[in-house]
């Protein structure tokens, strides 16, 4: 592969060599737990009707590194970072697409008739005309492999950028999953077992302990790579601090008004402790911020993909219609960040109360992260169910949609755990199965409904949270 980085200056050879070796080591580490995304990229590249691909994801989920790894499979790689003015100028000029293409290939010293050329347009939000150009890559040069990404793409889309409808496709990139975490720390065989839902009972406690570490550390690639190399959670503090500083330093890019910036900063400083909780904008942390200001700040942060506000489903059947009048549940990008900011890592690491550990908000939050990480489709929303009838309130942690089925998921451990809300959901539903994630082994129970009919309750180890669609598909 001939790699041309149009956004890098040439320095002393010794420094360049050291940097290249360093980056290669980092990329090798990240490759271990981004192989799922690499599989998707390979499928995209093999499509006959291939469209330019837009990578969507929050900052620091590994978009740029992923594409660089993918580029190893191409003969030529052209990297255009539009944070650099000379690269942005290629697209900003009022010239034809043909002239633009000539400039890109000339700058990269690559012939236009070369085979298997991957062009990566990074930080594309810096030049709106580059977004418009994606249409012409699709219409005039479908032989080229074009990927675009941007660290603040989501927050800027609503203001400046409109992607060409029907001429691009999207891929979501999330923090690494438990399977990818296992790959990263050298547990490839166990990763395959988890992926295949085939962990033997003799490895149950060992796998659950690793899932606990994953729940504490989270899945941000830089954090996982650091832990994989050093196996030292204390060292991760500096990594988390740097990541948080980056998110907070971007506030001015998220919003231009001082009031918006102040509210966003407040949420980024104190909102982590409300992870997996339902929140009310009017009473959020008892501050003086107006409800409308808090709501707007959360919407802005949601566009950056740092968090998601999940509104409840109130029906136990289709259609899926989240009730926007009810309080949403707050889910952050990464459970490791939540633990670090809330100062909970040590407590979680050394707790001896298994039921308290696995029945808490953090267990629910890591399950939410796994449910989202199981898909590369952009725009997927997590779901939960509430029943607010007078004298009969209930809440099911999550719902999962599989084809024409809408199934409840409860995160609740202990052999004597009460599942009252799940039973209420199933009394209103005609589904034949329900799911409980717990710290015990894989089992199932036949449960009678109030009307005398029955359903099967599957008790599933927590470490299979990312494989629930495959599990359900094997049962229905």
How should each PLM-predicted stretch be described?
Residues 63:
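Conserved lysine of the Walker
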Residues 367, 371, 396-415, 434:
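Conserved catalytic cores of phosphodiester-cleaving nucleases, focusing on short active-site segments
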Residues 228-395, 400:
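Accessory nucleic acid-recognition modules appended to NTPase machines
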Residues 442-476:
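Domain-level recognition of nuclease-like catalytic cores that cleave nucleotide substrates
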Residues 33-47:
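Pre-Walker A adenine-sensing motif
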Residues 84-114:
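Short glycine-rich substrate-engagement loop in P-loop NTPases that contacts/grips substrate
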Residues 157-274:
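Interdomain motor-coupling "hinge/lid" segment immediately C-terminal to the ATP-binding subdomain
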Residues 66, 70:
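Hydrophobic positions on the alpha1 helix immediately C-terminal to the Walker A/P-loop
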């Amino acid at each position: 592969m001939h790699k041309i980085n149009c956004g890098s200056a040439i320095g002393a050879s010794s420094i360049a060599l050291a940097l290249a070796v360093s980056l290669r080591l980092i990329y090798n580490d990240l490759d271990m737990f981004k192989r799922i995304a690499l599989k998707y990229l390979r499928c995209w590249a093999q499509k006959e009707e291939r469209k330019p691909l837009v990578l969507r994801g929050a900052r620091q989920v590994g978009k740029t590194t992923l594409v660089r790894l993918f580029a190893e499979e191409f003969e030529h790689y052209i990297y255009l970072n539009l944070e650099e003015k000379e690269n942005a100028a290629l697209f900003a000029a009022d010239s034809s697409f043909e002239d633009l293409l000539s400039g890109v290939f000339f700058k990269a010293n690559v012939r236009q008739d070369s085979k298997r050329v991957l062009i990566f347009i990074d930080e594309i939000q810096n030049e709106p005309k580059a977004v418009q150009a994606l249409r012409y890559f699709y219409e005039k040069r479908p032989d080229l492999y074009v990927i675009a990404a941007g660290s603040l793409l989501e927050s800027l889309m609503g203001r400046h950028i409109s992607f060409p409808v029907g001429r691009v496709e999207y891929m979501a990139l999330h923090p690494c999953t438990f399977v990818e975490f296992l790959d990263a720390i050298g547990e490839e065989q166990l990763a395959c077992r988890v992926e295949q839902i085939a962990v033997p009972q003799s490895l149950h406690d060992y796998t659950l302990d690793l899932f606990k570490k994953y729940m504490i550390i989270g899945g941000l690639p830089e954090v996982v790579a650091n832990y994989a190399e050093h196996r030292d959670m204390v060292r991760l503090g500096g990594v988390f601090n740097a990541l948080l500083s980056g998110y907070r330093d971007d506030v001015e890019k998220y919003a231009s008004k001082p009031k918006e910036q102040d509210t966003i900063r407040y949420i980024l400083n104190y909102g982590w402790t409300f992870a997996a909780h339902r929140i009310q904008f009017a009473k959020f942390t008892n501050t003086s911020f107006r409800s409308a200001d808090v709501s707007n700040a959360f919407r802005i942060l949601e566009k950056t993909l740092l968090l998601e506000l999940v509104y409840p489903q109130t029906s136990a059947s289709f259609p899926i219609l989240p009730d926007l009048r009810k309080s949403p549940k707050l889910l952050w990008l990464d459970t490791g960040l939540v633990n670090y900011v809330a100062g909970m890592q040590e407590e979680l690491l050394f707790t001896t109360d298994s039921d308290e550990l696995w029945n808490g908000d953090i267990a629910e939050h890591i399950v939410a992260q796994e449910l989202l990480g199981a898909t590369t489709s952009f725009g997927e929303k997590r779901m939960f169910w509430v029943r607010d009838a007078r004298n009969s309130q209930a809440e099911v942690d999550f719902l999962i949609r599989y084809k024409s089925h809408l199934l409840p998921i409860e995160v609740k451990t202990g052999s004597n755990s009460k599942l009252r809300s799940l039973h209420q959901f199933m009394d209103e539903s005609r589904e034949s199965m329900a799911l409980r994630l717990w710290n015990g082994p894989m089992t199932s129970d036949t449960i009678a409904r109030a009307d005398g009919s029955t359903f099967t309750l599957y008790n599933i180890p927590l470490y299979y949270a990312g494989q629930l669609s495959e599990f359900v598909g094997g049962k229905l």
